[in-house]
Design a protein with these regions (language model features):
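Post-transcriptional modification and biogenesis factors for structured RNAs
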Residues: 1-199
Length: 199
């Protein structure tokens, strides 16, 4: 059985959808506070449909509480931290029964200190470079070049949202996947690698 961990999720419908995915795959859902909603929120339950009452879900007071109650260390080999900042893709990882797939909040992802403490456990879902996937890509590439910044410079990062998307207040577009979609992609790869147990 796999474990889906949502660190500070903010959008109730995403958590409801992920809960539904957990039920139909036999995964456990772990919610690390703070949550951006109440679990009694009708949007959570609506997104989970009739599955919510069958969900194995645990809520934690914070990251340390989550680690302690599950007998994990910050860089435990059972942890897989999903972030756009990783070099290794999720498909390059090996998943084993009982692993924890950790996803950050919709607006800010997994906090930098947690990523730094487990840098070898970080994975990403491949996507087009942000500037390649945006309609205004050429304008933003030219803007960055005119400022003399590379995509890794501090100034360039400050003009990106937490997922690395360039922010143009007059023409904002998003090139990151939805949290629920991201969770399903990685969970089903883990299930594929383990032979879809019980399915």
């Amino acid at each position: 059985m796999f474990n889906i961990v949502l660190y500070a999720p903010e959008i109730p419908a995403n958590t409801g959808n992920i809960g539904r995915t957990c039920v139909v795959t036999g995964a456990c859902l772990h919610l690390v506070e703070p949550l951006g909603f109440s679990l009694d929120d009708k949007t959570v339950r609506r997104a989970g449909l009739g599955y919510w009452q069958n969900l194995d879900v645990t809520t934690y007071a914070g990251w340390e509480d989550f680690l302690a109650r599950n007998g994990l260390s910050p860089a435990d080999e059972r942890l897989h931290l999903l972030t756009k900042k990783a070099r290794r893709t999720y498909a390059q990882s090996t998943y084993r029964d009982g692993d924890y797939l950790v996803f950050g909040s919709e607006s800010s992802g997994i906090p930098e200190p947690l990523l730094a403490a487990a840098s070898e456990r970080c994975e990403r879902i491949p996507m087009l470079r942000d500037c390649d996937s945006l309609d205004n890509a050429e304008a933003w590439e030219a803007h960055e070049e005119s400022l003399g910044h590379t995509e890794d410079s501090h100034e360039a990062i400050l003009r990106q949202d937490i997922c690395g998307n360039f922010i143009d207040p007059d023409d904002y577009r998003i090139s990151a996947l939805n949290l629920s979609n991201s969770t399903a992609i990685v969970l089903y790869e883990a299930l594929r690698q383990t032979g879809f147990p019980g399915m």
